[in-house]
């Protein structure tokens, strides 16, 4: 597995776009914020924006793209939302309908006006752990970070509600 920890976000996005990276991005681009992408029909965007505002620990909102835009000008200048992520999971009416490496067709569909949200990701603090000498097991093993559904309710907003999901990292005891 190639080490992309010192790579720039732009370089990693280009490699993903070229199909050269197809794995989760944990451990990549140390020192940069990483984000999760949520893309919704415009008619749901306001409710989701409120959901993020009411639940900043669960959904730390980094940026919202203009309707129909495929880039985040502040956090991802030159990015292509539809092609710069190793794997997209598409949900319709709460059910996963497919996994894709390119979702351009969804953005190109004139019947859809989509709004994209960039949500902060726990991968962002992993470089600080590594710099402090704390091993990050999922990076060492090349697997995805463990995530758990809790019984902690998020504050609802419009059609959006649910319980908080947390990520966990096993930390060894100090010597």
How should these model regions be labeled?
Residues 1-6, 25-28, 79-83, 101-104, ...:
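Generic detector of short, locally flexible boundary/turn motifs and exposed helical patches
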Residues 14-18, 41, 67-68, 95-96, ...:
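A short linear-motif detector with a strong N-terminal bias
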């Amino acid at each position: 597995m190639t080490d992309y920890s010192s790579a720039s976000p732009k370089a990693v996005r280009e490699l993903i776009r070229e199909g050269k990276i197809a794995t989760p991005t944990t451990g990549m681009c140390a020192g940069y914020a990483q984000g999760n992408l949520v893309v919704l029909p415009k008619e749901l965007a306001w409710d989701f924006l409120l959901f993020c505002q009411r639940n900043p620990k669960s959904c730390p909102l980094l940026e919202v793209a203009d309707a129909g835009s495929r880039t985040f000008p502040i956090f991802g200048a030159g990015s292509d939302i539809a092609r710069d992520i190793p794997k997209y999971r598409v949900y319709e009416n709460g059910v996963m309908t497919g996994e894709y490496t390119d979702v351009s067709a969804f953005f190109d569909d004139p019947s859809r006006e989509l709004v994209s949200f960039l949500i902060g990701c726990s991968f962002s603090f992993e470089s600080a752990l590594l710099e402090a000498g704390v091993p990050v097991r999922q990076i060492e093993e090349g697997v995805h970070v463990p995530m758990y559904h809790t019984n902690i309710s998020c504050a609802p907003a419009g059609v959006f509600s649910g319980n908080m999901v947390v990520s966990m990292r096993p930390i060894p005891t100090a010597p």
